[in-house]
Curated annotation (Swiss-Prot):
It catalyses: 5-methyltetrahydropteroyltri-L-glutamate + L-homocysteine = tetrahydropteroyltri-L-glutamate + L-methionine. The keyword Ligase does not apply. HAMAP family: Meth_synth. Pathway: Amino-acid biosynthesis; L-methionine biosynthesis via de novo pathway; L-methionine from L-homocysteine (MetE route): step 1/1. Zn(2+) binds at residues 646, 648, 670, 731. Its EC number is 2.1.1.14. NCBIfam families: met_syn_B12ind (TIGR01371), PRK05222.1 (NF003556). Catalyzes the transfer of a methyl group from 5-methyltetrahydrofolate to homocysteine resulting in methionine formation. L-methionine binds at residues 436-438, 489, 604. This is 5-methyltetrahydropteroyltriglutamate--homocysteine methyltransferase.
Length: 758
């Protein structure tokens, strides 16, 4: 009999119930008990959704981030937060979000933990912090409470934890300690945890070690053997879980670890399955991730079964089936969608549907395909409908793609020639100030957008409301003394969705939300077909904003690589081809802005780095087509037009040469959480163009002081000539409140003025 299980379920709720509860709690609108009740209700719903599974993951729920949960479970709490008097949950949120100075009686100020991408996804985790003083201590109360709640509901529980080697690999040393020196003390705490789980009657534990799909150095492979030789002494059965790629050179040693089962991502590592079967001993389970946990397309059940049947014959009861990875990365339930085109909806599957597919696969293997004849036939119809649909294919787009050449990606002159012309045109001071694009999305803005969608506001009324917001943004920026302005993006719900809604080849869900970090959710658009731009997308808003000021106004566009990486992407052609289609559509927009005298244009590539394959040996192929797509989108303009790009959360040191090849006149980057550490690369690499290192963390409510900004920029000036430095926040300001924005930007402008005097 085939066993089916899941690796993780979306946390946020069908209608983002967790998001709204968190934000109410943070604003003191509900009590902690009410927040905990929301979490309890959601967990019960999740477990009910998974009631056909043989093993259900528990411990995958999180109030903010599962890596931060692991840090607290292991007692690895940053010293700046460990001695606060409030309860554990509030301390947890302070590490995640930071805490500003409030008043004289409550002086505690906490810096937020550093946040970075979870492997190559659009999820962000709070980076564990290590030092010579790190002392692990088991604090498993929250996990144990979840397990007991699930057991009381009759759930067959499989707890989920991040494995010890991956946990160390994900973290950052604060004093240059070798992270692997902490392995022995860390494994002791895992042993204690497993002992506690045995007392709860737990048979299997899921231990996530996704770094198995990366290129591990020998010392990390040795660490695996060392850790699992100890953990194998526990009576609990260990399911070692990898995902997001292939094992390759880690396959042999992973199969030889003293574990009871191994899960692989069979979507990406299908070619390794037979070698795994041959390499695993006969007493070990092989779990195959056969349903894609990263995308929203239906599984081709017929083709999958054809492949699985001989494997089932070989493995029999040793075969487990699961999604390729946690379903954290897909929306909750397709049945919530009532407005999607019927054909397109028939091609999709969200988390609930993926578990149904898993159940059908198991039934077909265990009871024969005759038991699911109707379901298989319906699935075949949907797969064929997508393959041949005229909604998907556009001959004109394919013809334009065929004509793309390298010349399209080249500027007329090099940066040194361009910057002279741009300096004369804009006449900006040293340390010019700007923001990244968005300003606070107030309740009034969201309400207007909502009413417009429902038809309660006419197009004219909506336009006037948005223009009023733009006017206010421009007035605020002029009053603050910023040098290069933005229109504030009140008309944009999301930087990808806004553009996708205006491009053919995209479709949008109502409730297709996924978690990005904490309470921040995104609704990735769905690329189902060939992409083109029917008409200008930003022109009216930007030109209106420019009419309100004599200062330069930045045009704001999301770049092709970010559009791709933050969308659910069609799976019937190479991603590089889809990205090039996007770049041509964006190029048309850039040229229209320039024709309308918008001569500073920012093309955001916030997600460039997250598209990198997890194995460095595969990076160059990705970077070649990604940088080409960016250059095609940006480089049709004249030398006087200044092109900016922005990258948030991008640890770009190892791709700095590729970023330089983008040839943007100005790049703005996230650096404040890392204390300008990201700029170390410029000791070795002479970056030729202009840079705006972010001077404060917009994800935290903390207000930066003038002195802190001056200090950060002085650090930056050690690496970059001051004539090529800009002053800006880390990222857009849409999630902040106006009072925070005004205070922070006031200090930023004052700091810039002080720097000019020096």
């Amino acid at each position: 009999m085939v066993t089916i299980h899941n690796l993780g379920f979306p946390r946020i709720g069908r209608h983002r119930e967790l998001k709204f509860a968190l934000e109410k709690y943070w604003s003191n609108a509900i009590s902690q008990d009410e927040l905990l009740q929301t979490a309890s209700t959601l967990c019960k719903q999740y477990w009910q959704n998974q009631n056909k599974l043989d093993w259900v993951p528990v411990g995958d729920f999180s109030f903010y981030d599962h890596v931060l949960d692991m840090s607290f479970l292991l007692g690895n709490i940053p010293k700046r937060a460990e001695n606060l008097s409030d309860n554990e949950l509030d301390n947890y949120f302070r590490v995640a979000r930071g805490r500003a100075f409030i008043n004289e009686s409550e002086r505690t100020c906490i810096q937020a933990g550093e946040m970075t991408k979870w492997f190559d996804t659009n999820y962000h985790y709070i980076v564990p912090e290590f030092s010579q003083e790190t002392n692990f201590a088991l604090q498993a109360q929250r996990l144990i409470a979840q397990i007991r709640q699930a057991q009381a509901q009759g759930v067959k529980v499989k707890p989920v934890v991040i494995g010890p080697v991956t946990y160390l690999w994900l973290g950052k040393s604060k004093d240059k300690i070798n992270k692997l020196d902490l392995l022995d003390s860390l494994v002791k705490v895992y042993t204690q945890l497993f002992d506690e789980l045995v007392k709860l009657g737990i048979e299997w534990i899921q231990v996530d070690e996704p770094i198995l799909v990366t290129e591990l150095e020998t010392d990390w492979q040795v660490a695996f053997r060392k850790a699992y030789d100890i953990l194998a002494n526990s009576p609990i059965k260990l399911l070692l879980v990898s995902y997001f790629g292939t094992l390759q050179d880690n396959l042999s040693f992973a199969c030889g670890l003293p574990i009871d089962g191994l899960h692989i991502d069979a979507i990406n590592a299908k070619d390794e399955v037979q070698l795994l079967i041959d390499s695993l001993s006969d007493d070990k389970i092989l779990s195959l991730g056969v349903v894609n946990g990263r995308n929203i397309w239906k599984t081709d059940l017929s083709t999958t079964l054809l492949w699985l049947e001989p494997i089932h014959q070989q493995l029999q009861n040793r075969l487990w089936l699961a999604p390729s990875c946690s379903l954290l990365h897909v929306p909750v339930d397709l049945d919530s969608e009532q407005e999607l085109n019927d054909d397109i909806k028939s091609w999709l599957g969200f988390a609930v549907q993926k578990l149904e597919e898993l159940s059908l696969l198991a039934q077909a293997l265990n009871q024969g395909q005759a038991s699911v004849t109707k379901e298989i036939a319906n699935n075949i119809d949907a797969i064929n409908s997508k393959k041949y649909s005229p909604l998907v294919h556009n001959a004109k787009v394919k013809e334009r793609i065929a004509k793309v050449n390298d010349e399209l990606g080249n500027r007329q002159s090099d940066y040194k020639s361009r910057t002279k012309l741009q300096s004369e045109k804009f006449n900006l001071p040293l340390y010019p100030t700007t923001t990244i694009g968005s300003f606070p999305q107030t309740l009034e803005i969201r309400q207007a957008r909502h009413d417009y969608k429902l038809g309660k506001l006419s197009a004219e009324q909506y336009m006037q409301t948005m223009r009023s917001e733009i006017r206010y943004c421009v007035q605020v920026q002029e009053h603050l003394g910023l040098d290069v302005l933005v229109h504030g993006e009140p008309e944009r719900n999301d930087m990808v969705e806004y553009f996708g809604q205006q491009l053919s080849g995209y479709v949008f869900s109502q409730f297709g939300w996924v978690q990005s970090y904490g309470s921040r959710c995104v609704k990735p658009p769905i690329i189902f077909g060939d992409i083109f731009r029917p008409k200008p997308m930003t022109l009216d808003w930007i030109t209106y904003a420019q009419s309100l000021t004599n200062k330069p106004m930045k045009g704001m566009i999301t770049g092709p690589v970010t559009m791709l990486n933050w969308s659910f992407v069609r799976d019937d052609q190479p991603r590089a081809t889809t990205c090039l289609q996007l770049s041509l559509a964006i190029r048309d927009e850039v040229l229209d802005l320039e024709k309308s005298n918008i001569n500073i244009i920012q093309i955001d590539e916030a997600a460039l780095r997250e598209g990198l394959p997890l194995r460095k040996s595969q990076w160059q192929t990705y970077l070649d087509w990604a940088i080409r797509a960016y250059r095609v989108s940006a480089n049709g303009v004249s030398d006087e037009t200044q092109i900016h790009t922005h990258m948030c959360y991008s640890e770009f040191n190892d791709i700095i040469e590729a970023i330089a090849q983008m040839d943007a006149d100005v790049i703005t980057i996230e650096t404040s959480r890392s204390d300008m550490e990201l700029l170390d690369i410029f000791d070795e690499f002479d970056y030729p163009n202009e840079i705006g290192p972010g001077v404060y963390d917009i994800h935290s409510p903390n207000i930066p002081s003038v002195d802190s900004i001056v200090e950060l920029m002085q650090k930056a000036a050690k690496y970059i000539p001051i004539k090529r430095l800009w002053v800006n926040p880390d990222c857009g300001l849409k999630t902040r409140h106006w009072d925070e924005v005004n205070l922070a930007l006031t200090n930023m402008v004052l700091a810039s003025q002080q720097l000019r005097k020096n």
